[in-house]
Curated annotation (Swiss-Prot):
Its cofactor is Ni cation. This is Urease subunit alpha. It comes from Polaromonas naphthalenivorans (strain CJ2). Binds 2 nickel ions per subunit. Pathway: Nitrogen metabolism; urea degradation; CO(2) and NH(3) from urea (urease route): step 1/1. Keywords: Cytoplasm, Hydrolase, Metal-binding, Nickel. Ni(2+) 1 binds at residues 139, 141, 222, 365. Ni(2+) 2 binds at residues 222, 251, 277. Its EC number is 3.5.1.5. GO terms for molecular function: nickel cation binding; urease activity. It catalyses: urea + 2 H2O + H(+) = hydrogencarbonate + 2 NH4(+). Substrate binds at residue 224. The lineage of its organism: Bacteria, Pseudomonadati, Pseudomonadota, Betaproteobacteria, Burkholderiales.
């Protein structure tokens, strides 16, 4: 039997079982756990497109029509990196969704084929490439529409939050308040190759105005201290959410004016909600908002400005906070408010709580202290920093960091999808889900994707000079592709809405072009449902020293003086 060397095989068909890859310039290594292309019975039946390759008529390309089961697109020899595994496979796309994960080819002449290539099948060659689910950013201030392209080029394909543009309320809070504003934002969503969902304003002590917003289509309600997150508002907002199966996101009371963290916890009465700022630099009860990490009904997330903790983190935060929350540095009380939120001890503990799987999600807080294009970068920077400072996690080996990688990718993919009731559509690479997929060169993983697919069609890519004779000459930069134009935009993306809004006929009333998908199964979600990130420690925060303990363990780490995934990738 003919043989081929492991390196030569990897260079031709991509890595297989036992091969390892470094993620960008981090210290994180992944090892391929399984190879679904071996369903043919072993090596030798791989498919590959190109001159002299196998995807040709009568070879790995069958005669079958798309109606007879041939795929619209096949992504060949991809290394899938997802919460459920790190595996080599071919990925079949049909009708804008993931139709199959396995072995592609021509079943008439090849064994083990479960993904049919036909004359009507496009090929995206993923040999040597990593494929992930599109990222989900659940903390968006919709301050400017240009955020959407910035997020898409970073590998984010779903954005959830609130706002109406550069209004003062939107600078500070993620709320799209009232049915008229909600309708305008839903109509605007039709223009973008991005899945979008909007939060209404949840700060009210009576339910009528909240029901009005849910009926207009918001996927959840945001409680923000700048609008008054009182115990009465918390309880009322959760009452409405329980009745309508939408999420509640909370930014709690930094100043402890209307109650302390204990009062906020009590006001929830055990009902589920998302703690958008689980560390206080972003906002929330000072100094002990981290207490909610130990509560089973709080789904904790971080925003990216404090992630990971570096030598520059503290210095940049005061000015950011003054701008975002409409504060005046000439007013002593405003300055004290800002400084009360910025504590190096709790910021350092946040890094470790992510590594322990106690904080479940990552998000941006776009243009409101966070950077919309850096959710993915900062997630992996923290994973790298924690490996350097804390060593291997249980389940990892000297050869690989597979468990740590699965824990961290879940923070911006499947877990926000579960928390916001959209995991039936997006959040992972699984059969039946919307084909929002991101293709990366391993050397650029987490930083600069090569191709971003929306609904199974390429919407954005790193593309060279359009006047060049080939696609690769400089200047190479991100350019919208055909999936970002015309009717393809509406077909390739979803707008998430409430069940009540969908039932009320908002698609027709507002004249919406995109497919609407209702959020669901939200109110039963608990911390235990956060994949790889469901650790529920007993939290203690010293009110004088701000030192943080989880199950008695002191959580402290040094700030990073340098990080991977930074300057060397952004020379141009």
């Amino acid at each position: 039997m003919a043989t081929i060397g492991r390196r030569a095989y990897a260079e031709m068909f991509g890595p297989t079982v036992g091969d390892r890859l470094r993620l960008a310039d981090t210290d994180l290594m992944v090892e391929v756990e399984a190879d679904y292309t071996l369903r043919a019975g072993g090596y030798g039946e791989e498919v590959k497109f190109g001159g002299g390759k196998t995807i040709r008529d009568g070879m790995a390309q069958s005669q079958r029509t798309n109606a007879e089961g041939a795929m619209d697109t096949v992504m060949t020899n991809a290394l899938i990196l997802d919460h459920w595994g790190i595996v080599k496979a071919d990925i079949g796309l049909k009708g804008g969704r993931i139709a199959a994960i396995g072995k592609a080819g021509n079943p008439d002449v090849q064994p083990g084929v479960d993904i049919i290539i036909g004359p009507g099948t496009e090929i995206i060659s993923c040999e040597g490439m990593i494929v992930t689910a599109g990222g989900i950013d659940s903390h968006i201030h919709f301050i400017c529409p240009q955020q959407i392209e910035e997020a898409l080029t970073s590998g984010v394909t779903t954005m959830m939050g609130g706002g109406t543009g550069p209004a003062t309320g939107t600078f500070a809070t993620t709320c799209t308040p009232g049915p008229w504003n909600i309708a305008r934002m839903l109509q605007a969503a039709d223009a973008f190759p991005m899945n979008l969902g909007f939060l209404g304003k949840g700060n009210a002590s009576l339910p009528a105005a909240l029901h009005e917003q849910v009926n207009a289509g918001v996927i959840g309600l945001k409680l923000h201290e700048d609008w008054g997150t009182t115990p009465a508002a918390i309880s009322n907002c959760l009452d409405v959410a329980e009745e309508t199966d939408v999420q509640v996101a909370i930014h709690s009371d930094t100043l402890n004016e209307s109650g302390f963290v204990e009062n906020t916890i009590a006001a929830t009465k055990g009902r589920s909600l998302c703690a958008f700022h689980t560390e206080g630099a972003g906002g929330g009860h000072a100094p002990d908002i981290l207490r909610v990490v130990g509560e089973a009904n709080f789904l904790p997330s971080s925003t990216n400005p404090t992630m990971p903790y570096t030598v520059n983190t503290l210095d940049e935060h005061v000015d950011m906070l003054m701008v975002c929350h409409h504060l005046d540095p000439a007013i002593a009380e405003d300055l004290a408010f800002a400084e009360s939120r910025i504590r190096k001890e709790t910021i350092a503990a946040e890094d470790i709580l992510h590594d322990l799987g106690a904080i479940s999600m990552m998000s941006s807080d776009s243009q409101a202290m966070g950077r919309v294009g850096e959710v993915i970068i900062r997630t992996w920077q923290n994973a790298h920093k924690m490996k350097q400072q804390r060593g291997k996690l249980p389940g990892d080996t000297e050869r690989h960091d597979n468990f740590r990688v699965k824990r961290y990718i879940a923070k911006y993919t499947i877990n926000p999808a579960i928390a916001h009731g959209i995991s039936h559509e997006v959040g992972s690479i699984e059969v039946g889900k919307f084909a929002d997929l991101v293709v990366w060169k391993p050397a650029f993983f987490g930083i600069k994707p090569s191709i971003i697919l929306k609904g199974g069609f390429i919407a954005m890519a790193a593309m060279g000079d359009p006047n060049a004779s080939i696609p690769t000459p400089q200047p190479v930069h991100y350019r919208p592709m055909f999936g970002a134009f015309g009717g393809a935009t509406a077909r390739g993306s979803l707008t998430f809405v409430s069940q009540a809004g969908l039932a009320a006929g908002i698609k027709e009333r507002f004249g919406l072009a995109k497919t609407l998908s209702a959020v669901k199964n939200i109110r039963g979600v608990r911390k235990q449902h956060m994949i790889h990130n469901n650790y529920l420690p007993k939290m203690e925060i010293d009110a004088q020293t701000y030192l943080v303990r989880a199950d008695g363990q002191l959580l402290t780490c040094e700030p990073a003086s340098s990080l991977p995934m930074t300057q060397r990738y952004f020379l141009f």
